Each structure stands twice: as structure tokens, then as C-alpha cells.
A protein has these predicted regions:
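Single conserved hydrophobic/aromatic residue that forms the stacking wall/gate
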Residues: 1-12
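Amphipathic alpha-helical "stem/stalk" segments
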Residues: 17-138
């Protein structure tokens, strides 16, 4: 009886992980597609060219970055609950850090919103930023 229920528990856990991975993939795709919005694309090109952003472009990028950070925080929670394995989380964590490479706008967004995130997640983001601090130009 306990072997059967344990086996059933394993099935539910695998199904939960599969559903979680699907949810993560869909959320990632949504954020990626949102980043293809013409306003955001123009703004990203201006950032690359070191050109001044319009107010609309900056606001759009700030909202988009905040959505990305919230999605990553959700992945952090899923990892803590065992829905994401260590390798998947490690990959996501690295991707999170790349958002700050030579990007003072994203750094400013993070510094202004950090207190609204889970403290443990905030510490992870700060560690990822610290590893890339030599990419920031004054």
C-alpha cells in the first residue's frame, strides 16, 4: 500500500515539475515576445548606440525589466519548492546576471525596486551584479 502511494506521489511530482517547466517556458516566451514590441526595440537600439531615450522608451524598458525580474523571482520560488532542479536554476541565474552587463538603466531599476523582492532573491541578484561590476561605465 505504501509502495503504491509512494509511486503515485512520484508520478504527481514529475507531473508537477513538467507543468512547472511548461509554465516557465510560456512565461519566458511572453516576456521575450513583449521585448519585440517596436517601442522596446527602438529603445534597446538606442541603449546599444548610447543614445538618449525618450520618456516613453525609458518607461517601457523599466516596465519590461521589472516584469523580467518578477519572472526570475518566480523561478527562484519554484527552485526552492523543488519544481526546478539545480542545473535549471543555475542556468536561469546566469541569464539573470547578463541583464546587468554594461546596462546602467537595468542597474538603476534594480536598485530602486530591490526592496520589493524576496530578500534571499535580492541577495542572489546582487551577487550576480557584483560578478559583473567591471562592465559598468560611469
Amino acid at each position: 500500500d505504501t509502495t503504491w502511494s509512494r509511486g503515485l506521489g512520484d508520478v504527481y511530482k514529475r507531473q508537477g515539475k513538467a507543468a512547472s517547466r511548461q509554465s516557465i517556458a510560456e512565461a519566458h516566451q511572453e516576456v521575450t515576445l513583449a521585448g519585440l514590441d517596436p517601442l522596446l526595440m527602438r529603445a534597446k537600439l538606442k541603449l546599444i548606440k548610447k543614445e538618449k531615450l525618450s520618456i516613453d522608451e525609458e518607461v517601457g524598458l523599466r516596465i519590461h525589466m521589472t516584469a523580467i525580474l518578477r519572472a526570475r523571482e518566480n523561478h527562484f520560488y519554484q527552485h526552492k519548492m523543488g519544481m526546478l532542479d539545480d542545473e535549471e536554476w543555475k542556468t536561469m541565474r546566469k541569464a539573470l546576471g547578463t541583464l546587468f552587463i554594461d546596462n546602467n538603466l537595468n542597474l538603476d531599476i534594480w536598485n530602486k525596486s530591490k526592496s520589493t523582492f524576496n530578500p534571499e532573491f535580492a541577495k542572489i541578484v546582487d551577487e550576480e551584479i557584483d560578478m559583473r561590476k567591471d562592465t559598468f561605465k560611469k
